[in-house]
Amino acid sequence: MRRSFQAAVLLSLAILFVALATSFGWGENADRLITNKAVDTLPDEMLPFFQASRQFLVQHVKRPEPPLPAPNALPGTTKRPPDTDVALPDTDFIQLDHYGPFPFTALPRDYNSAISKYNRRTLAQYGLLPWEIGVYSKKLTDSFRDHNWGDVRINAAVLAHFVIAAHDPFNTTINFDGKASLQPGVNERFNTGLIDRYQLFFFVKTNDAVFIHDPTDYAFEMVLTSHSWVEPILLADRRAHVGLSDYKEDYYDRFYAQAGAILVNQVSNAATDVGSYWMTSWINAGRPQLPSQ
């Protein structure tokens, strides 16, 4: 029985977690650090199960590409309408600045309203991240309610991936790789280079997980906050490179001095928010008793 369960989980992972050939966002160390810290934000009733699942979650949070609901599926459902023809190669971003100036009020937060205004193809092209978070919050709730602990682990990892992605400022902008501002690679220097070099020296300060009343709306607030840091990071990158011909240690020391506080803030908030989404799904499922492992 145990071997059959393990085989089923591995089969699900083979389907769900496919590495993307070209992708942007937090580096592997950041994803794992945030997920590890998120476990410790949970209430006592959830801790034993998630502590036992910690290694699984940390291992599988990076770059899952699950079979996603159709672009015009309602948040919280996976129903695929018959006229859907839009492929979704990657949905862990939303390029908010396509929709006008901050705070992007031209983009409806209601999915059906957004489709009516812009069409499915446009939404798919410029990213579905907040709605995907809503979808996978519901999927995790359903897994908790069904006592399907294998699916709980899988959906918790997928949900964590999307929530973490929402805290990377470069997942929220058309200038996702810095080329538009003539700063190619600034995204990787911020979300991977700084983490890899300095994570042992900064303190990730998390808060206890809290209940999220509207997972999709809260996801929009997360990406808005992340987007507000794009310009300060770009400015820090430009200043750090003044007088230098490369992006080596002198550059990174300068960059961290100017943008390190933003990085630590985003990592800390991401860990708290991942835990909050997990707890919210559990509460919405009726607070089922979780197995200890």
Model-derived regions, located:
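Bacterial N-terminal signal peptides
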Residues: L10-A19
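Alpha-helical and His/Cys-centered functional microenvironments
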Residues: L10, T35, H167, N171
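N-terminal, motif-rich segments that launch catalysis or mediate targeting to/interaction with membranes
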Residues: A19-V158, I174-D250, R254-S268, T272-Q293
